[in-house]
């Protein structure tokens, strides 16, 4: 059994992800429990799109999304980015491609004035979507990330990958093992002592795939447990692409709509360089700092949800200003308005 598993893992490394310019992303739609808006449906003119972080999914913050939907009287789409959750496994995985997937989602669902919420990986996807496709975006909440390359976080990505590959390649946990999730957590612990991080990564570990879900590189019928992400194929993409940013592509792009940045004061993600880039690309910004690490959604769940609700409710009836393409020297900097909690 163990030798067979090693062979399968060696074979899976050779399998390349298919190349797809865009994929149709899996999603869940959360509607308000009660609303004054009649006939609220999937085509409501200003829905919220909630995008998860690396190795997250549309299932990561379901209750938070429901709370946001009801508090803002707005439908919330939680989406699976490619290579996550129930969305297709495909390359490439650069930010321009991920933003193109978001545009395809908006086009296919006839959404033309969306409000974006993005955390970590999803934050960068949200920022690039707003910069490249400003006609689609009214406003955004960006949770603890900045529009710059961040090689300093590659170490975190490598640790995540090591821990997940240990489960797949060394732990030898069968799908019918009743204690499979606890054993997987124990295998990951030496690389990831933080239990919250392990819990979030393990949310993508399954002993059977979702109904009607298939992967070109994962054999879900081999009797073993698997992550829903193509981990072997994503190793380089997670380390290189996720920590990168298309600087040349965005050097002259500015989004003029309102953007709230939620920053963790103990997080390394928004540096001074990142703060300057935010002022350049998103002049109509405001900051809200939380006493948190990068894991804001787990450490300060009530606070971040309230910040999102307040921001979207305040800007609900504003018309989005025209977004333009400007050089950095051609537009005034707007001093970020900071609030602390």
Curated annotation (Swiss-Prot):
InterPro entries: AB_hydrolase_1 (IPR000073), AB_hydrolase_fold (IPR029058). One of its GO terms (molecular function) is transferase activity. Residues 47-301 form the AB hydrolase-1 domain. Keywords: Hydrolase, Transferase. Pfam families: Abhydrolase_1. GO terms for cellular component: mitochondrion. Its EC number is 2.3.1.-. SUPFAM superfamilies: alpha/beta-Hydrolases. It comes from the Eukaryota. The active site is at residues 120, 144, 294. Probable alcohol acetyltransferase that uses acetyl-CoA to synthesize acetate esters from various alcohols. Not involved in the synthesis of ethyl acetate. PANTHER family: PROTEIN ABHD11. Belongs to the AB hydrolase superfamily. This is Probable alcohol acetyltransferase. It comes from Wickerhamomyces ciferrii (strain ATCC 14091 / BCRC 22168 / CBS 111 / JCM 3599 / NBRC 0793 / NRRL Y-1031 F-60-10).
């Amino acid at each position: 059994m163990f030798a067979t598993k090693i062979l399968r893992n060696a074979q899976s490394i050779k399998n390349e992800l298919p190349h797809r310019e865009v994929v149709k992303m899996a999603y869940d739609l959360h509607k308000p429990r009660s609303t004054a808006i009649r006939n609220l449906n999937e085509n409501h003119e200003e829905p919220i799109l909630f995008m998860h972080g690396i190795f997250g999914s549309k299932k990561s913050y379901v209750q938070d999304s429901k709370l946001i939907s009801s508090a803002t009287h707005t439908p919330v789409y939680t989406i699976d980015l490619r290579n996550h959750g129930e969305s297709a496994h495909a390359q490439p995985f650069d930010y321009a491609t991920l933003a193109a997937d978001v545009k395809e989602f908006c086009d296919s669902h006839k959404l033309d004035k969306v409000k974006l919420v993005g955390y970590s990986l999803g934050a960068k996807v949200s920022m690039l979507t707003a910069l490249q496709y400003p006609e689609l975006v009214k406003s955004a909440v960006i949770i603890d990330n900045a529009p710059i390359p961040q090689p300093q976080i590659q170490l975190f990505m490598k640790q995540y990958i090591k821990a997940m590959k240990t489960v797949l390649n060394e732990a030898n946990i069968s799908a019918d093992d009743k204690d499979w999730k606890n054993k997987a957590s124990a295998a990951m612990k030496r690389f990831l002592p933080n239990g919250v991080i392990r819990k979030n990564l393990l949310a993508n570990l399954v002993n059977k795939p979702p109904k009607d879900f298939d992967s070109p590189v994962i054999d879900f019928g081999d009797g073993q447990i698997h992550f829903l992400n193509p981990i072997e194929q994503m190793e380089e993409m997670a380390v290189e692409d996720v920590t990168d940013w298309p600087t040349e592509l965005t050097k002259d792009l500015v989004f003029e709509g309102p953007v709230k940045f939620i920053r963790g004061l103990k997080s390394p993600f928004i540096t001074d360089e990142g703060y300057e880039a935010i002022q350049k690309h998103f002049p109509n910004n405001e900051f809200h700092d939380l006493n948190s690490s990068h894991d804001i959604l787990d450490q300060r769940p009530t606070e971040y949800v309230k910040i999102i609700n307040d921001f979207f409710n305040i800007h609900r009836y504003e018309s989005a200003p025209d977004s333009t393409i400007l050089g950095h020297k051609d537009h005034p900097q707007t001093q970020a308005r900071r609030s602390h909690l």
